Amino acid sequence: MSWNFNDERPIYLQLIEQIQLRIVSGVYKVGGKLPSVREMASDASVNPNTMQKALTELERTGLVFSQRTSGRFITEDSNMIKVIRNGLAKEQIEKFLYNMEKIGYTKQETIQLVEIISKEMK
């Protein structure tokens, strides 16, 4: 999974979202240890201070926690991860519906089209 950034929002906020996505998708395992700040910053091609800022914010939310000599770990709170997963999905759906509306689809037409395409993909 590559790290993709745009110029519309601060990088650290995009890092937070992408780390959350990696957690809910299983790239980073629940209860598992995260790579070091430097390693993650290198992988994402960002400044380590920017990565540190994102990880500090994730710690503040409780999704990630530090153990002094062992590094950072992902919470095992499945409810928290489910809430984050649903939040990420909601954002994607809202963007999708907004874009479909921009090209002239009503919500009902969009739902019908999604159902048709979903059946075709099976």
Q: What is the predicted function of each stretch?
A:
Residues 33-65:
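N-terminal helix-turn-helix
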Residues 48, 61-64, 71-73, 116, ...:
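A general secondary-structure boundary signal
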Residues 24, 56, 76:
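Alpha-helical and His/Cys-centered functional microenvironments
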Residues 1-33, 39, 87, 91-122:
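Extreme N-terminal segment that seeds HTH/winged-HTH DNA-binding domains in transcriptional regulators
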Residues 80-85:
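Short, charged/polar, Gly/Pro-enriched secondary-structure boundary elements
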